[in-house]
Amino acid sequence: MQARWRFTDRSYGDLAIGSAGDLEQRRRSIVDAPWTWLEQVHGAAVVVVGSAGEHAGTRADAAVTDQPGAALAVQVADCVPLVLVGTSPSGAAAVGVVHAGWRGLGDGVVEATVAALRRLGATGVAAHIGPHIRRRCYEFGAAELDSVVCAVDPAVRSRTAWGTPALDLTAGLHHVLAAARVTTADDAGTCTACSPAHYSHRARADTGRQAAVAWLEQG
């Protein structure tokens, strides 16, 4: 099988749950298959999807599948949209999506998703990192920053472009991925706070959301 994924931006429309207009049509314009979307709660729960559309609306922050035609999605504005591709000697074995904010990163959502992919038969895992807020724009309270440092790694401690304490989500994610023996295949490199093409709750109080969508195809 082959893994496919897409990181959307404003040009795909608002993909927030409950957004105005025909959300289903916007989804199907991206991938014409039933979506498993999640009621995200900034936790570490992972759902295993056995058929297209299964577990849609479940309270979780990650999903994995080894079934072709099942589209998995997470919605974000500044948190990290992460696609994980589980590989085997014969190709893609499974795929997963993760909503990785600072709480989920500290609670182990990435590690839980990697473990779920390995239970589905993945012998290797590669990460594809989507657009998210970067350290130069992510001002963070000192006490909360200390808690993330303790939960993740000192590498998350940084400074904004204007010199105040900041959280480096990217550095934290790279640390977690390396510890989980995951290869980082690529990083979009885009900061949602800086990019007018993306929604950002922090920078512009946007209520809209972009998405990471991943699925498997036969072939």
Placement of each model-derived feature along the sequence:
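Active-site microenvironment for binding and transforming phosphate-containing groups
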Residues: 1-219
